[in-house]
């Protein structure tokens, strides 16, 4: 039997033993971590995941390196999509990969000691270097894709927050309300424009009340975006009524040379609602 086949057979035979040792030496103080051994079911799930990790890892001895890394990468990426791994701080996952590396290296040293005569000069170091390389590859791949998943989740949450912070509320068959509150930055202004136009077109809104009384700060950019929205609404046949315009908003609008002549303006939202009843 060739050396690589012996290594594959040795590590395949010790999968259960290594997984058991990994679990037995685990110390996790964070109760919310994936690695907190709450009960027998959780423990067995983790152990099976570790067995699976070793089974995939062991193919490094019998597959061409390029093919092995491509197939192994697919498994690691699949692992990063596991919700429990996503919910666990990445430093904990890295810590366990490093513990696995130390454990795996220990078993490699054991094999090398028992089969010293099977190694050609420099061959032991070659396999030891490959083990380190594969574990480094594992950690890098996991961190890279975990970060990508985290960004996707963050973007989804941000979009949800943006949508909730600028809702188009239906008041009647043809009238709706857009209450704007808080700070408006460039990203939010762009979302408000796109979301409002889509919502009005979809609901066949003919008249939109835009209330600005909750907007904290109004600078030149914000004022420009608000009136850009009004112009865009006009192009799709939606008339706009503004309410809650504070003096600083009016001043900024005048400085920008914005034309109010085609816009209905009311002092507050109550007046705007009464106007359309």
From Swiss-Prot:
UniProt-listed Pfam families: STAS
Top-level taxon in the UniProt lineage: Bacteria
Residues with PTM Phosphothreonine: 186
* Disulfide bonding pattern of the chain: none
Keywords in alphabetical order: Phosphoprotein
UniProt PTM comment: Phosphorylated by RsbT.
User: What region holds the STAS domain?
Assistant: 165-276
Decide whether keyword Phosphoprotein is in the record. Answer: yes
Mutant lacking the gene: phenotype: Cells lacking this gene have an increased sigma-B activity in response to salt and ethanol stress and also increased sigma-B activity in response to the energy stress associated with entry into stationary phase. These results indicate that this protein is a negative regulator of sigma-B activity.
Q: Does the keyword Phosphoprotein apply?
A: yes
Subunit structure and binding partners = Interacts with RsbRA and RsbS in the stressosome. The stressosome probably also contains RsbRC and RsbRD.
Annotated function? One of 4 functionally non-identical RsbR paralogs, it functions in the environmental signaling branch of the general stress response. Negative regulator of sigma-B activity. Non-phosphorylated RsbS binds to RsbT, preventing its association with RsbU. Requires any one of RsbRA, RsbRB, RsbRC or RsbRD to sequester RsbT. When RsbS and the RsbR paralog(s) are phosphorylated, they release RsbT, which can then bind and activate RsbU.
**Protein name (database record):** RsbT co-antagonist protein RsbRB
Give the originating organism.
Bacillus subtilis (strain 168)
What gene codes for this chain? rsbRB
């Amino acid at each position: 039997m060739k050396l690589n086949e012996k290594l594959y057979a040795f590590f395949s035979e010790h999968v259960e033993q290594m997984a058991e040792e990994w679990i037995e030496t685990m110390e996790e103080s964070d109760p919310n971590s994936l690695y907190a051994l709450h009960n027998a079911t959780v423990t067995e799930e983790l152990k099976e995941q570790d067995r699976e990790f070793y089974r995939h890892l062991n193919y490094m001895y019998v597959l061409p390196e390029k093919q092995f890394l491509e197939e192994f990468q697919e498994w690691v990426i699949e692992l990063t999509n596991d919700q429990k791994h996503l919910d666990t701080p990445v430093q904990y996952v890295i810590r366990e990969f490093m513990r696995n590396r130390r454990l795996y290296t220990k078993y490699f040293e054991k094999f090398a000691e028992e089969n010293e005569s099977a190694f050609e000069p420099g061959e032991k170091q070659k396999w030891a270097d490959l083990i380190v390389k594969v574990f480094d590859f594992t950690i890098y791949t996991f961190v890279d894709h975990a970060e990508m998943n985290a960004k996707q989740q963050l973007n989804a949450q941000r979009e949800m927050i943006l949508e909730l912070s600028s809702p188009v509320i239906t008041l009647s068959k043809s009238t709706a309300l857009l209450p704007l509150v808080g700070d408006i930055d460039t990203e939010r202004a762009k979302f408000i424009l796109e979301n409002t136009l889509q919502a009005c077109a979809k609901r066949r809104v003919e008249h939109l009340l835009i209330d600005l009384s909750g907007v904290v700060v109004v600078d030149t950019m914000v004022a420009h975006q608000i009136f850009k929205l009004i112009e865009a609404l006009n192009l799709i046949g939606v008339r706009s009524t503004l309410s809650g315009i504070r003096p600083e908003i009016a001043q900024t609008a005048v400085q920008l040379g914005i034309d109010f002549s085609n816009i209905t303006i009311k002092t507050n939202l109550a007046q705007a609602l009464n106007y359309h009843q």
